[in-house]
Curated annotation (Swiss-Prot):
Binds 2 Mg(2+) ions per subunit, one in each domain. Mg(2+) is required for hexamerization and phosphatase activity. The gene is kaiC. One of its GO terms (biological process) is regulation of DNA-templated transcription. In the homohexamer the 2 domains (called CI and CII) self-associate to each form a 'donut' layer; the compactness and local conformation of the domains varies over the cell cycle and impacts function. CII has the autokinase and autophosphatase activities, both CI and CII have (weak) ATPase activity; CI has the clock pacemaker role. SUPFAM superfamilies: P-loop containing nucleoside triphosphate hydrolases (SSF52540). The keyword Metal-binding applies. Belongs to the KaiC family. This is Circadian clock oscillator protein KaiC.
């Protein structure tokens, strides 16, 4: 018999659980202080009431009901209104501030009856208990408390409600719960973490077990924003989006020719090169073409301020300010270090949802990669590209190469495998002078020009000239000239090798 699941309503978490939490069973949500355990349990109840019309009971062993209601308000959840509508009941089991003496044998019979009565009275389908740790802290006999909690869970299962219990742990990767017994009395275990990585906090959620059913394995990043918890279940993303044959212009006619007629409408383009090679200018031309077609576009800038972007675009004859005034362009500027990658991803998704652009640009990915782990950065890129493709948006990303000249790697963070089109921009030294070169390194699903061509930046924007004839190893950082005889000799040698094969 298949286990029925109850959607929590927490964005992304139900994807990790592959449908939600098992119905009529208990789930332990464990984490260190500040990981979001109480927020998780409140969001579970609030979404159940508001989205699934399932009344709930919240049992608090730590904070007072007044504090619970006040804190929930910061996420836009009006618990008092739900209480007034008899859709939510908050049972206060918090300790007496004046202290209390325990006489005789400890049991939770009275509390169990109060919870049972509230469930029946309000016809509750969901219960949240915050937290089990507080119960253990109030009483010394751990084995007795474990027995009583087991009784409580058994009663809740008998009634048929789906329960979420929180518990505190000491270390992010230590024992599941502080007293080492909480996980054994629950059917399911969810772990919330708030790990310090490169001087930044990164929140993750892991479903350790869902008894009798399947779930996704591993840790998944999440954020706590204005509307509560959002989980980024990247592993749940499916490659089911449609693929368009419609072409869009890059804003540079010669580059369109190099790409076989322009970019595909739903493609992700990456321009990579050293600083000053013209990446931001290509972004500006890409955005200008959207405006020319009366399409909306959005820019996420992590290296330059809005004023700098406007000034630079103006120098190329592009009026970003007018585009903004016409409601066809939105510019979001932020320091990469202002928040974590997951929060940046959530901001990008929110802005795209609200503005509904047909094109987006991120300048640059390398700025966001500073001071974060390779895995976290890769997850961010997958999240952005996946969402852009889901919304059928053309995306243009830039990446600043560390090497000023010579070859550089674009595969270290696996960005190259995620993007559809890659433009290589590079400085080259020819006859004692510095020049720029451009090459369409990759274009998925289309013919493209393989030549390395000269790339010139003028007051009117970019110009793409002919290829560097009679030169080879342009991108190696040490180009050298070949004579006409050498070139012809090379052709015959190549033909000779083919004949021998």
């Amino acid at each position: 018999m298949q286990v029925q699941k109850l959607p929590t309503g927490i964005e992304g978490f139900d994807d990790v659980c592959q449908g939600g939490l098992p119905t009529a069973r208990s789930t332990l949500v464990s984490g260190t202080s500040g990981t979001g355990k109480t927020v998780f349990s409140l969001q579970y109840l609030h979404h159940g009431i508001c989205h699934f019309d399932e009344p709930g009971v919240f049992v608090t062993f730590e904070e007072s009901p007044l504090d619970i209601i006040r804190n929930a308000g910061s996420f836009g959840w009006d618990l008092q209104e739900l209480i007034n509508q008899d859709k939510l009941f908050v049972l206060d089991a918090s300790p007496d501030p004046d202290g209390q003496d325990v006489a005789g044998n400890f049991d939770l019979s009275g509390l169990i009856e109060r919870i049972s009565y509230a469930i029946k009275k309000y016809k509750a389908k969901r219960v949240a208990i915050d937290s089990m740790t507080a119960v253990f802290q109030q009483y010394d006999a751990v084995y007795v408390v474990r027995r009583e909690i087991f009784r409580l869970i058994a009663r809740l299962k008998e009634i048929g409600v789906t329960t979420v219990m929180t518990s505190e742990r000491i270390d992010e990767y230590g024992p599941i719960a502080r007293y080492g017994v909480e996980e054994f009395v629950s059917d399911n275990v969810v772990i919330l973490r708030n790990v310090l990585e490169s001087e930044k906090r990164r929140r993750t959620v892991e479903v350790l077990k869902l008894r009798g059913t399947t779930h996704m394995k591993g840790e998944f990043p999440f954020t706590m924003g204005a509307e509560g918890i959002t989980v980024f279940a990247l592993g749940a993303m499916r490659l089911t989006q449609r693929s368009s044959n419609i072409r869009i212009s890059s804003g540079v006619p010669d580059l369109d020719d190099m790409c076989g007629g322009g970019y595909f409408q739903d493609s992700i383009i990456l321009a990579t090169g050293a600083t000053g090679t013209g990446k931001t200018m290509l972004v500006s031309k890409f955005i200008e073409d959207a405006y020319r077609n009366q399409e909306r576009a959005i820019i996420f800038a992590y290296e330059e301020s809005r004023a700098q972007l406007l000034r630079n675009a103006t120098s190329w004859g592009i009026d970003f300010e007018q585009m903004e005034a016409d409601g066809l362009l939105k510019i979001i500027c932020a320091y990469p270090e202002s928040t974590g990658l997951e929060d940046h991803l959530q901001i990008i998704k929110t802005e795209i949802t609200e503005f509904k652009p047909s094109r987006m640009a991120i300048d640059s990915l390398s700025a966001l990669a500073r001071g974060v782990s390779l895995n976290a950065f890769r997850q961010f890129v997958i999240g952005v590209t996946g969402y852009a493709k889901q919304e059928e948006i053309a995306g243009f990303f830039t990446n600043t190469a560390e090497e000023f000249m010579g070859s550089h790697s674009i595969t270290d963070s696996h960005i190259s495998t995620i993007t559809d089109t890659i433009l290589l921009l590079q400085y080259v030294e020819i006859r004692g002078e510095m020049a720029r070169a451009i090459n369409v390194f990759k274009m998925r699903g289309s013919w493209h020009d393989k030549r390395i061509r000269e790339f010139i930046i003028t007051n009117e924007g970019p110009e793409i000239k002919d290829s560097f004839t009679n030169f080879e190893q342009i991108f190696s950082g040490a180009p050298h000239r070949i004579s006409g005889e050498d070139s012809i000799s090379g052709v015959f040698k190549s033909l000779d090798k083919r004949e021998k094969k």
